[in-house]
Amino acid sequence: MIQSITSQGLVLYNRNFREDDKLVKIFTEQVGKRMFFVKHAGQSKLAPVIQPLVLARFLLRINDDGLSYIEDYHEVMTFPKINSDLFVMAYATYVAALADASLQDNQQDAPLFAFLQKTLELMEAGLDYQVLTNIFEIQILTRFGISLNFNECVFCHRVGQAFDFSFKYGTCLCPEHYHEDERRCHLNPNIPYLLNQFQAIDFETLETISLKPGIKQELRQFMDQLYEEYVGIHLKSKKFIDSLADWGQLLKEEKK
């Protein structure tokens, strides 16, 4: 079945196909992720809008049994501030790849599309891209079938405690029940507290957010542990972020 639709869409990536053609993967609001064929991409009027992290309203010809086609576009947003900063662009690319990994092709998920779009808009507006990424990561876990409780102790259900996380139980322990898991994570109690807050944050009302560098580093390390344990995906974009962290540390040392 072939149908023409108009939909908001975010370009996830493109790759070469034959000599001058490209396959372009777009996450659309209406019909989910689709692969689109662009013939003679280098000379095509579509060339400006088939680059990664371009958001536009596309006129699309959708083919449920094969490749789809881009017929036209308007209302283009290119996120210039994101693209002008290597670090921000790396994190933006990662959250887009994470959304891609969490959703099957051809499956509509308008709430996820809106969440990804708002994340990129907040990065473009200058909010802390590392913290925005952590919030995106913790909220998108449900798309991988993972639900974690950072609000209460698994044994006594008390709230507002200096919680630690236990991979043995897959949830939090209060100080009175730390002994239940000798291999608990020994986290800074601020980490479970922040993740509990992050799970409830609504990006539509978020205006500012700021955390100290040390806390952000601890968050990053624990999020990596969570994803390794529960999700098990290894995205190239995440590996690039890790390499940038090493590079950034080298730059700091050279400036001393």
From Swiss-Prot:
The keyword DNA damage applies. Involved in DNA repair and RecF pathway recombination. Plays no role in chromosomal or plasmid transformation but is required for resolution of chromosome dimers occurring as intermediates in the formation of merodiploids by transformation. This is DNA repair protein RecO. One of its GO terms (biological process) is DNA recombination. Belongs to the RecO family. It comes from Streptococcus pneumoniae (strain ATCC BAA-255 / R6). It comes from the Bacteria. InterPro entries: ARFGAP/RecO, DNA_rep/recomb_RecO_N, NA-bd_OB-fold, RecO, RecO_C. The lineage of its organism: Bacteria, Bacillati, Bacillota, Bacilli, Lactobacillales. Keywords: DNA damage, DNA recombination, DNA repair. GO terms for cellular component: bacterial nucleoid. SUPFAM superfamilies: ArfGap/RecO-like zinc finger, Nucleic acid-binding proteins. Disruption phenotype: Mutant is sensitive to the alkylating agent methyl methanesulfonate and the DNA cross-linking agent mitomycin C. Disulfide bonds: none annotated. The keyword Repeat does not apply.
